[in-house]
Design a protein with these regions (language model features):
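C-terminal His-loop and adjacent cap/lid subdomain of alpha/beta-hydrolase
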Residues: 14, 37-666
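Sec/Tat signal peptide C-region and signal peptidase I cleavage site
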Residues: 32-36
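Generic alpha-helical structural signal
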Residues: 5-10, 25, 548-550
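Bacterial N-terminal signal peptides
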Residues: 25-31
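Short, Lys/Arg-enriched N-terminal segments with co-localized hydrophobic residues
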Residues: 1-17
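Sec-dependent signal peptide recognition
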Residues: 19-25
């Protein structure tokens, strides 16, 4: 199949006009055959995207809003993995139904597109791919209506068809928030444990629980400064229910700062069958790429207009994809592959606690919270391994290997994930030894980056963080990596080798020896998130063992040696890190969540010597501005040659360097 078909450019124009007419007349509600997993696909809106803006050869885009109803047979082995599916209410055919919100962004004329379907797994209902790949600011990245919402136009300029499918059944469906309406097990109750770090001093502190409280009298709360401390119930600590979901925690007057860890336990009621979210993504993507009926809004000239599918997700959504693969959902109910490629972004070695009763899909255990949370358990990596800690043999690709439905995988992480999300477990075995990734897997660490930064951010402060926050946006390398993923799938062109710290290379080390220098203004204490194995069958989980966790080796500027090193690290004007300690008064023995730090270099040798800074000053590094700009251009050319930067991004970054804005310090 050609990468970008250019023939039959108007073959589907009549069909597109007919679809618009149907929508304008009211609602397009079409029913698929009964044996299909998607039994109803209801288009509620089909309008021009980006205010009719056109994108070169691809032309204009349509924004389609729909609702997809899936119908699952609990007896099908491919569905049997879904927790509580057998307990859910059934329809007349004995199947269990759920309905997902769907948004599709497709070329006006599908034949002008690239043939690639990019499924951006919603993050708490939101669209994040446009923000990362297109530098599109929120809320425009979530709306896709105004001309500027397309940002740089990278994705649409390539002719990509983008899809979002609501999968999260514990959030409401709302404008700008895609969700799944799943069955609820009325009257079922169970114990739930949640953790809160408030990072403010208001007292009492409000909090929202994941599930409805069955018995407000059973609500209890404990406090400790960090997770490894003993739980305490000091004088003045209490919790009360304001309604079924909202509570208020009264905090002790002394003994704990604003970053203390509060653990709330209660009996919850009426769980939803959350695991159906995995099936919703599986079945809708399989339907869109393979169904040839008029029901499918991606059909062109009687056949689907997409030829390959890539699953992409940021943070929570990246963890979703790792679980999706591990649970076997990359095989549809006809035994076919769903995604040809997967790109989990900033997931680290984590998964998620979704496919269980009273799961918490939105929970992200952050330092100093529970390192043994049910989402963060073995297996951590793609290869199948024996785990001496849990006694299990497993791997994220175990099930897809058995069914021959494994995708090509490109996991990308910020540097923050190697400090906060145990990313070293991707490339070590449970004993801490070097581990090679499978040949169909690549891993890339975007060195010097926080978990996620908005495009256009500059140096700033957060009250609860000790250091200025790192503003580095990962868009440029991520655009290059998406292009290489498409080439890998469409043309068989191997992507660059993995670029991550590794034990065998000496770039993945114990935290105590990672920093070779003492840098004023960049205090290093080796803080990172541990990995524990715990018994969750008891109300207060009991730790049974730990896995070795390593961190990136740093250079004398305090920056990671390995990984995909952005131009800001190769030709630096400051130190950029993936970690940022909490400030005094906010739990300083822990990391501030999701952030890195940036500490500018001194202007001259005299200034740095006076402050005791061992890092060469700007004047010592670059003879003048012209030398700095030339160094940036040279580094950009090298990154393009390695396929880690696109030519147009190389030019844009060089222009920013010339304007004094590449470092994002102002």
């Amino acid at each position: 199949v050609p990468y970008r078909p250019t023939d039959h450019l108007i073959a589907n124009k009549e069909e597109t006009d007919m679809r618009r007419t149907a929508v304008l007349a009211g609602m397009l509600a079409l029913t698929t055959p009964a044996m299909a997993q998607v039994t109803r696909f209801e288009v509620t809106e089909d309008v021009p995207a980006f205010a009719g803006r056109s994108f070169g050869e691809v032309g204009g885009y349509r924004r389609i809003t729909a609702r997809a109803t899936i119908s699952l047979d609990p007896a099908d082995p491919r569905n049997a993995v879904i927790a509580d599916l057998g307990m859910a209410p059934r329809n007349a055919e004995g199947r269990v139904e759920a309905t997902a919100d769907v948004v599709i962004l497709r070329p006006e004329e599908l034949a002008r597109g690239s043939g690639t379907l990019l499924l951006d797994v919603p993050n708490r209902g939101r669209k994040l791919a446009p923000q990362l790949f297109d530098d599109s600011p929120q809320p425009g990245a979530n709306n896709l209506r105004a001309a500027d919402d397309a940002g740089t136009g990278f994705l649409v300029g390539r002719g990509t068809t983008m899809v979002w499918v609501g999968w999260q059944a514990d959030i409401p469906s709302a404008p700008g928030q895609l969700a799944l309406t799943a069955p609820v097990l009325q009257g079922v109750t169970g114990a739930v444990r949640e953790e809160f770090v408030f990072d403010h001093r208001r007292n009492p502190a409000p909090a929202t629980l994941a599930w409805n409280i069955a018995d407000p009298a059973g609500l209890s709360v404990t406090v400790r400064q960090v997770w490894s401390d003993s739980r305490q119930v000091p004088e003045g600590l209490s919790a009360r229910a304001l309604d079924a979901r909202r509570i208020e925690v009264s905090r002790p007057a002394q003994g704990f700062d604003a970053g203390a860890l509060y653990e709330v336990t209660y009996t919850a009621r009426d769980p939803a069958v959350l695991g159906m979210g995995f099936a919703a993504v599986r079945d809708v993507v399989s339907f869109l790429r393979r169904d040839s009926s008029a029901t499918n809004p991606l059909v062109s000239s009687g056949r689907p207009g997409v030829h390959r599918a890539i699953g992409f997700g940021v943070s929570q959504s990246g963890r979703f994809l790792r679980d999706f693969l591990h649970l076997g959902f990359n095989e549809d109910t006809s035994g076919r592959i769903v995604f040809d490629g997967l790109m989990p972004h900033v997931a680290g070695a984590r998964r998620m606690a979704t496919n269980l009763r009273f799961g918490q899909p939105g929970r992200n255990a952050r330092h100093p919270q529970d390192p043994a949370w049910q989402a963060d358990t073995f297996p951590f990596t793609y290869a199948v391994l024996e785990d001496p800690v849990s006694g299990r043999r497993d791997g994220l690709m175990l099930r897809c290997r058995l069914s021959s439905t494994c995708p090509r995988i490109m996991q990308t992480d910020s540097e923050h994930e190697w400090w906060a999300s145990r990313a070293s477990l991707l490339v070590t075995d449970p004993a801490g030894h070097h581990l090679d990734l499978p040949p169909d897997v690549r891993a890339y660490m975007i060195a010097g980056t926080p978990h996620f930064a908005n495009p256009g951010e500059t140096l700033g402060r957060i009250e609860a963080a000790a250091l200025p926050k790192n503003p580095m946006h990962a868009g440029p390398p991520m655009r290059a990596l998406l292009a290489t993923m498409e080439a890998w799938l469409a043309e068989g062109v191997e992507p660059p080798t993995s670029r991550v710290p590794m034990r065998a290379h000496g770039t993945l080390v114990p935290a105590g020896v990672a920093m070779p220098a003492t840098i004023p203004g960049l205090p290093y204490a080796g803080i990172h998130t541990p990995a524990a194995h715990s018994d969750h069958s008891v109300r207060a989980p009991r730790e049974l063992g730990r896995y070795p966790v390593f961190v990136p080796l740093l250079d004398r500027d305090g920056m990671a040696v390995a990984g995909v090193r952005a131009l800001q690290l190769v030709v630096p004007r400051a130190s950029y890190t993936g970690w940022n300690p909490r400030a005094e008064g906010f739990g300083p023995a822990a990391l501030y969540p999701l952030q890195g730090a940036v500490v500018p270099f001194a202007a001259t040798r005299e200034v740095r010597v006076a402050s005791g800074d061992p890092r060469p000053s700007l004047a010592e590094r670059y003879a003048d501005d012209a030398a700095y700009i030339a160094a940036v251009r040279s580094a950009a050319e090298a990154a393009v040659a390695e396929r880690l930067l696109l030519p147009r991004d190389a030019e844009a970054l060089a222009a920013r360097a010339a304007a004094g804005r590449l470092d994002q310090l102002r």
